């Protein structure tokens, strides 16, 4: 084979395995054919390993073929700074023919063999390419049909009308604490993700009706896969930009290539951007840092041992007392200084081994910790007229309003066994176990207007366990038809809640003409945020009353049916209809509109009165996705959803949930232009349109009495803000040299500066003439993020002595 002159080259290598047993496949033919007609071929060895050397950089199709297995096609993007390491999973054919060639599964098909519907694979490549995603898996997932972000300031996602509280993050089989900076206790999102996409391999995202191994969720699951570091040469990545400065290093830990490391860290301070006049959405400067690592060892017995970790910390001070200009538009509450910080971390040990050609075991032990702490000072302010005639705000006095510290430590264990009974039957059994210790302390003023009269709202030290066993079975009826069935169970000791059997089923039929139909359903259950069980509203410090400690699981039944067709040139269309019934939703005992179904997407905790599991909810909708995967330097994605999301509180009234925007549509497109052999210019555009947020009428008297925004209960979610619209644009330039790849990018979020309304906020006027005027309301509209330019410079390079 000849090398194309002056074009940088790179290595493609990896491992070919059976998709169900994970055992290595010997003799798999791996082939790359480039545009010039030149071909690169390799055969996998006894351990399933293959290597293609000196492949020209660029976008290529990697095709893997093996007798009695489906053909698999993988799109590979090669750069000169990093080797491409792939794991290619092949599915065994049912038909007993000597050799059969079958069109491989579509790009983006999920890694989990048990998933038949409502699932999507996402890659690092996609999180980088989609405008507005900020290299964040959650924000990237908001482009999928049925998914939308809750607001611009956070990465919480709403899946089919469900609260973000129902989203579960998993890594190597164990459940993670909220992997976001500035995360409110019990939530699943935040302003900035701790998860760095450079740390991940291809991963799965599930939207309800998921396989039996996933539990404690009525909404969705991110099943994250951590990639291994390069085990043959040392590679480095550096990046500087709006979201922080980061470094990553990876490489072998011995000369045999049996051990590797991957270490990365990031630190961000946005004060420099604020000083030069770039708006970052707030006058307060958020400070955060995070890191991750993975050490991987290939053991002599054929097993694999990995030590991994992830963590981050963040702090912010929102000091309204420093603001002198008279305006109602404050970030946060306009009558208090707020100091808030969070931290999370997880360290785990994962072991994987093929016991034989048909049986595979994986297990993980991990410890994780999360902390949230805050204190607020109440401000008594007035207006001061200066000698110049200007009016400014002065602080007459301030005093402590509230403070809290929550700590949760979790000891987790996970084990699962895959056994391939035959070509047609696969069974998987396993269990997740969590031991959780809690230390919760919180005090707040009984009456905001009366200093130093505090009540201990949380004062709890204790422990609980969450146990989730499962079993699932896959029946490959033929090469065209699959059926899955499973059962998930769940027990939570704090509330003594038990869901003894949650059945899950899925079915898929692949028809002629590259099209398929699929259907499935399942029962699911979910515990509430831990702090809601230990709230002490009515008791004293000496005799606390945990009035919600016996709160049961919220439950749901979710069903779906869909159709998918693939056309030439990488174009596909997919549509899915779903129906979800939620029951045993926690609502107040006293008749009201309150329901836990509406919470989980704000910077506030919930202070719930006595709750009972009598609420209900209904979500149903129709989704469509038209997509062209990145091929021949172009991609596009259209996703649209029409949906309805309603609930009933304890007052028996059917209302819109807080996430019932009725519709959401996304259109993304991107094009890369090659300039010579080594330069690539990338352009991407994204347009989002969605129904506005629901809200209600303000109870002015109660708001003034409580010093906090209070809505009329009877009119909750009866109004709607105007529709949401946002245009994002991304521009990038990439240069490949012999051993380096340089990339400069600019992500222009909300390019048009559209003023989308986030909600109302409590903003009392300090002017007596205004506050006494007829029709006065102590509120202000709070808008979402304005125009935000996010730039970065990234460099990938390898050590000079590596080839």
Predicted feature locations:
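Periplasm-facing N-terminal accessory domains of Gram-negative outer-membrane beta-barrel systems
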Residues: 4-99, 103
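Periplasmic N-terminal accessory/gating domains of Gram-negative outer-membrane beta-barrel systems
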Residues: 70, 77-85, 99-210, 221, ...
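Surface-exposed extracellular loop regions of Gram-negative outer-membrane beta-barrel proteins
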Residues: 180, 321-322, 326, 444, ...
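Transmembrane beta-barrel wall of Gram-negative outer-membrane proteins
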Residues: 241-267, 280-319, 339-367, 421-422, ...
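Flexible loop and strand-edge segments within Gram-negative outer membrane beta-barrel domains
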Residues: 282, 304-354, 369-394, 398-407, ...
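Outer membrane beta-barrel strand-and-loop segments of large Gram-negative receptors
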Residues: 402, 410-412, 457-462, 468, ...
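Gram-negative outer-membrane beta-barrel transporters
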Residues: 579-581, 601-691
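C-terminal beta-signal and adjacent terminal beta-strands/loops
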Residues: 636, 687-707, 724-726, 733-803
């Amino acid at each position: 084979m000849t090398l194309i002159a002056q074009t940088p080259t790179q290595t493609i290598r990896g491992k070919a395995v059976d998709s169900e047993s994970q055992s290595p496949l010997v003799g798999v033919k791996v082939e790359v054919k480039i545009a010039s007609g030149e071909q690169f071929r390799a055969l996998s060895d006894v351990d399933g390993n293959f290597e293609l050397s000196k492949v020209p950089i660029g976008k290529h199709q990697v095709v893997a073929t093996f007798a009695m297995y489906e053909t698999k096609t993988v799109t590979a993007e090669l750069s000169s700074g990093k080797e491409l390491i792939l794991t290619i999973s092949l599915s065994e054919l049912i038909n007993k023919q000597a050799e059969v060639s079958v069109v491989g599964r579509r790009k983006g098909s999920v890694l989990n063999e048990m998933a038949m519907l409502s699932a999507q694979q996402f890659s690092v490549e996609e999180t980088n390419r989609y405008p507005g995603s900020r290299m964040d898996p959650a924000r990237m997932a908001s482009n999928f049909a049925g998914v939308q972000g809750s607001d611009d300031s956070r990465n919480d996602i709403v899946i089919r009308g469900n609260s973000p509280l129902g989203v579960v993050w998993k890594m190597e089989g164990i459940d993670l604490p909220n992997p976001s900076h500035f995360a409110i206790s019990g939530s699943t999102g935040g302003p900035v993700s701790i998860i760095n996409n450079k740390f991940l391999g291809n991963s799965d995202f599930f939207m309800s009706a998921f396989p039996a191994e996933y539990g404690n969720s009525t909404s969705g699951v991110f099943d994250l896969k951590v990639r291994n570091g390069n085990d043959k040469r040392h590679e480095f990545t550096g990046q500087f930009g709006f979201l922080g400065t980061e470094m990553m290093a990876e490489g072998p830990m011995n000369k045999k290539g049996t051990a590797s490391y991957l270490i990365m860290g990031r630190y961000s301070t946005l004060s420099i951007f604020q000083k030069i006049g770039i708006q970052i959405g707030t006058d307060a400067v958020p400070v955060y840092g995070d890191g991750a690592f993975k050490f991987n060892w290939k053991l002599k017995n054929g097993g694999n041992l990995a030590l991994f970790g992830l963590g981050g910390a963040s702090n912010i001070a929102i000091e309204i007392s420093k603001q002198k200009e008279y305006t109602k538009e404050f970030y946060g509450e306009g009558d208090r200084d707020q100091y808030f910080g969070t931290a999370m971390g997880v360290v785990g040990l994962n072991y994987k081994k093929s016991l034989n050609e048909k049986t595979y075991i994986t297990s993980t032990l991990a410890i994780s910790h999360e902390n949230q702490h805050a204190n607020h000072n109440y401000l008594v302010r007035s207006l001061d007229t200066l000698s110049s005639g200007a009016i400014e705000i002065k602080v007459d006095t301030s005093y402590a309003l509230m403070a809290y510290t929550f700590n949760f430590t979790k000891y987790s264990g996970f084990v699962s066994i895959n056994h391939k009974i035959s070509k047609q039957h696969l069974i998987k059994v396993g269990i997740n176990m969590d031991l959780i210790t809690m230390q919760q302390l919180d005090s707040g003023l009984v009456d905001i207007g009366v200093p130093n009269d505090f009540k201990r709202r949380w004062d709890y030290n204790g422990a609980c366990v969450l146990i989730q066993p499962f079993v699932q079975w896959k029946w490959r009826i033929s090469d065209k038809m699959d059926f899955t069935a499973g059962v998930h169970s769940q027990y939570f000791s704090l509330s003594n809640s038990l869901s003894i059997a949650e059945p899950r089923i899925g079915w898929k039929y692949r028809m002629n003409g590259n099209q398929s139909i699929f259907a499935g359903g399942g029962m699911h259950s979910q515990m509430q945020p831990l702090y809601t069980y230990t709230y002490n509203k009515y008791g004293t410090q000496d005799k606390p009353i945990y009035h919600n400690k016996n709160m049961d699981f919220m439950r749901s039944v979710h069903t779906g049916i869909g159709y998918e067709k693939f056309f030439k040139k990488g174009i596909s269309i997919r549509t899915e209809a779903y129906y979800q019934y939620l029951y045993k939703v926690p609502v107040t005992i006293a008749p009201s509109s309150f329901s836990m179904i509406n919470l989980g997407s704000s910077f506030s905790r919930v202070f719930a009165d006595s709750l009972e599991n009598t609420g209900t909810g209904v979500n149903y909708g129709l989704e469509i996705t038209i997509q062209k995967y990145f091929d021949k330097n172009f991609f596009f994605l259209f996703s649209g959803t029409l949906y309805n999301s309603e609930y009933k509180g304890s007052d028996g009234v059917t209302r819109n949930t807080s996430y019932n925007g009725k519709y959401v549509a996304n259109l993304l497109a991107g094009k890369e232009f090659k300039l010579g052999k080594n330069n690539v210019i990338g352009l991407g555009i994204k347009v989002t349109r969605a129904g506005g947020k629901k809200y209600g009428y303000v109870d002015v008297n109660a708001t003034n009495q409580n010093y906090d925004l209070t809505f009329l209960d009877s009119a909750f979610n009866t109004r709607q803000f105007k529709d949401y619209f946002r245009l994002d644009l991304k521009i990038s330039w990439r240069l490949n040299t012999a051993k380096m790849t340089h990339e400069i990018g600019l992500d222009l979020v909300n390019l048009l500066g559209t003023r989308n309304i986030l909600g109302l906020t409590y903003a009392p006027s300090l002017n007596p003439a205004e506050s006494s005027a007829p029709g006065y309301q102590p509120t202000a509209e709070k808008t979402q993020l304005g125009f935000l330019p996010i730039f970065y410079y990234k460099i990938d390079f390898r050590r000079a002595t590596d080839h």
